[in-house]
């Protein structure tokens, strides 16, 4: 047991334009080499593209996309008697949101195209429409958990 005090959970402050914590969390995920203003510009351009194409509130589209991507269960490796089992565990809300944001940024970076803002906008719209690579990743995660349901009694 650690004798130190436990660290308090710090939550991201809302971004200046949309006043949304979700946008500021996405800003941190896209961040490279501490260039936060560039990261914000990429996100705002992506949300403008989403607004042009869908003619609706881009923040609602982003929230819908995150909701669609957020996994409900995931597998965690657990070593029992010399063999490693993939144990399915439920995902807490904050971790689920973090995973969704991580997957959105990863798969938008992997997309082919010119600008990051265009790739991010396409990934957000695909996720809102329940298509795209990030949705496939969520389904793969759920499939892994379903396949290893037999080891659920090894839960932490």
Swiss-Prot record:
One function term, GO molecular function aspect: structural constituent of ribosome
Query: Its GO CC terms?
Result: chloroplast; small ribosomal subunit
Q: Which UniProt keywords apply?
A: Chloroplast, Plastid, Ribonucleoprotein, Ribosomal protein, RNA-binding, rRNA-binding
Q: Which InterPro entries does the entry mention?
A: Ribosomal_uS7, Ribosomal_uS7_bac/org-type, Ribosomal_uS7_CS, Ribosomal_uS7_dom, Ribosomal_uS7_dom_sf
> Which SUPFAM superfamilies does this entry report, sorted A to Z?
Ribosomal protein S7
Q: Does the keyword Plastid apply?
A: yes
| Pfam families hit by this protein | Ribosomal_S7 (PF00177)
A GO BP entry? translation
Q: Where in the cell is it found?
A: Plastid, Chloroplast
The record's listing under Gene3D superfamilies reads:
Ribosomal protein S7 domain
* Family assignment from sequence similarity: Belongs to the universal ribosomal protein uS7 family.
Q: How does it assemble?
A: Part of the 30S ribosomal subunit.
What's this protein's function?
A: One of the primary rRNA binding proteins, it binds directly to 16S rRNA where it nucleates assembly of the head domain of the 30S subunit.
| Name listed for the protein in its UniProt record | Small ribosomal subunit protein uS7c
Q: Whose protein is this, by species?
A: Pyropia yezoensis
């Amino acid at each position: 047991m650690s004798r130190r005090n436990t660290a308090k959970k710090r939550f991201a402050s809302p971004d200046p334009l949309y006043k949304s914590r979700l946008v500021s969390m996405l800003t941190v995920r896209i961040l490279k080499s501490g260039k936060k203003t560039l990261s914000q510009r990429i996100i705002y351009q992506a949300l403008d593209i989403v607004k042009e194409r869908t003619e609706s509130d881009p923040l609602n589209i982003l929230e819908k996309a995150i909701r669609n991507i957020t996994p409900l269960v995931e597998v965690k490796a657990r070593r029992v008697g010399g063999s490693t089992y993939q144990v399915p565990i439920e995902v807490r809300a904050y971790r689920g949101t973090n995973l969704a944001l991580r997957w959105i940024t990863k798969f938008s970076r992997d997309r082919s195209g010119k600008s990051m803002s265009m790739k991010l906008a396409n990934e957000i719209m695909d996720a809102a429409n329940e298509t795209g690579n990030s949705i496939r990743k969520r389904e793969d995660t759920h499939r892994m958990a379903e396949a290893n349901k037999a080891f659920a009694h090894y839960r932490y």
